Amino acid sequence: MRRFELIAPCHFGMESVLKREITDLGYDITEVADGRVTFFGDEEALCRANIFLRTAERILIKIGNFHAETFEELFQGTKSLPWEDYIPKDGKFWVAKAASVKSKLFSPSDIQSIMKKAMVDRLKSQYEISWFPEDGASFPVRVFLMKDEVTVGLDSTGESLHKRGYRKLTAKAPIAENLAASLIMLTPWNGGRILVDPFCGSGTFPIEAAMMAANMAPGRNRSFTAEEWPHIVGKKIWYDTCDEAEEMVDLSVETDIQGYDIDEDMVKIARENARMAGVDKLIHFQRRGVEDLHHPKKYGFIITNPPYGERLQDKSQMPALYRTIGERFRELDSWSMYLITAYEQAEKDIGRKADKNRKIYNGMMKTYYYQFLGPKPPKRREI
């Protein structure tokens, strides 16, 4: 089998969670950098990473890296890479995204254009042809520039891995599925204790939690760009990995996951999304406002993404909303609460300083993941 260096981008601040996921899959980490984790793996690893990783955004095959401070250096560095090892004569190839941080070359469109020209030059000389039909499989390329160091990767995923295939309907500001999974994995929740999302919207937190509880691979019901690359990854490897994912699913698991929302239409959407994900039997959705948040069970988890006044007309309502969250949480005195929000007065209005607070970028928006820790449940006595 071919051996690759694979790059898995993720949300900034979630690198440690992704690193743990990759290690649990059995692969060796080579680098952890801001917003990405790099590891070694073969063709099977590429398939398994795409299908099993919950917190990654995509999986790139690292083509190479080089130093470039000028467009000429960028051109020559790109041209020196072994593109013919990956892209066939009829391949459709382009630089899908270029990102530059603290580098002399900073214009994404110029970087993309020059790299495409360099790729064409390289492939012309290797294949000894002057024109490419580009009517075959797709080979999108992604490039990162950090302090003039250029890292080039071939995107094996296509649409971002957060697109699991179940969320056909959404709330106004839904949280990305892979970010929701990352935030759940930052908690001690493991399926054995109740989990409630009192602002469930389209149901992302409860659905991702249910998929974890049922050991359901997030990529089992979607396609990937690399499925069109039989010269790199054989079809049988994809089939075998999909079979592995199906065999792992356990819908008989006992778990208590609940999602509430004040909007009945959102509750209906959440139920439909859960059905599409195949976990509707594992989640109880209900129309309920946060002021009615209560539960007889002890040692539960609240994991949620409450409103944070992103619209001007909503800002005045935020203090009262977060005070209500704090009041309800104090009544659940054995519970833990985890909430992601961009509302900077959250701790003040909740009435308690968070035990932990992690800054996370949700897209371009700076948010905070407040972690209010409850007591640990007593250990069961051994019989």
For each predicted feature, which ranges?
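Short, charged/polar, Gly/Pro-enriched secondary-structure boundary elements
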Residues: E44-I51, E159-H162, P378-R380
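Non-catalytic nucleic-acid substrate-recognition regions in nucleic-acid-modifying enzymes
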Residues: R2-F139
